[in-house]
């Protein structure tokens, strides 16, 4: 869950949200966080009541029947497919930057952008997706170990960023607070919502959790 929430979204979408909301992006994070917290509480309650694998599919099946559960299941497949593509593209930017700065190799734009962005194919994104797929194939223990390491790296990076940024905060940088008004803040909140998504992955482990009625909500 932590690995999914503290992921590509918080690193990549922050710049996009800043363009929409400016300093008001702070309010966007709060709005998106409150909405996600409400959804997360629902997931926690359902996971405690129906402690089996399947997440939203199982909850829909138990409450509304097979047809709705079937629709939710396919919606989840679409969601995870789109999310995997978005995360792969986000990591692609980091891979390209690393290759260009560390090895001084310039990759043609046609090979790092999809057709929608004027390129042919995003090879780094495909490589990232293939690597993650390979980790999942070789075993849960190995992929969990890699995920734990990556979570540690991401949390450390955020902690270092906060420690370095707080001493140089100037209130002049927060004026104007919302250059595009509430419309910009709400648009940024919609983008930032993706950065919080991942709490639903926690509920999938309810069946393997000891005392899920107590531990899942926590």
Q: Which stretches of residues belong to each language-model region?
A:
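Structural signal for membrane-spanning alpha-helices in multi-pass inner-membrane proteins
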Residues: 40, 132-136, 158-165
């Amino acid at each position: 869950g932590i690995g999914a929430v503290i992921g590509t979204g918080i690193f990549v979408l922050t710049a996009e949200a800043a363009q929409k909301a400016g300093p008001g992006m702070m309010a966007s994070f709060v709005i998106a966080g409150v909405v996600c917290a409400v959804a997360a509480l629902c997931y926690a309650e359902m996971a405690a009541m129906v402690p089996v694998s399947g997440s939203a599919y199982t909850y829909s099946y138990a409450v509304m029947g097979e047809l709705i559960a079937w629709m939710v299941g396919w919606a989840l497949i679409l969601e995870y497919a789109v999310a995997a593509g978005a995360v792969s593209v986000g990591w692609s930017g980091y891979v390209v930057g690393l290759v260009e700065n560390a090895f001084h190799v310039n990759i043609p734009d046609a090979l790092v952008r999809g057709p929608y962005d004027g390129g042919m194919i995003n090879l780094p994104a495909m490589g990232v997706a293939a690597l993650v797929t390979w980790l999942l194939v070789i075993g849960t223990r190995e992929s969990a170990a890699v995920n734990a390491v990556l979570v540690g790296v991401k949390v450390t990076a955020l902690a270092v960023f906060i420690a370095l940024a707080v001493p140089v905060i100037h209130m002049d940088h927060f004026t104007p607070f919302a250059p595009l008004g509430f419309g910009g803040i709400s648009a940024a909140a919609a983008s930032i919502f993706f950065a919080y998504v991942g709490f639903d992955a926690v509920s999938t482990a309810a069946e393997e959790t000891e005392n899920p009625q107590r531990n899942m909500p926590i």
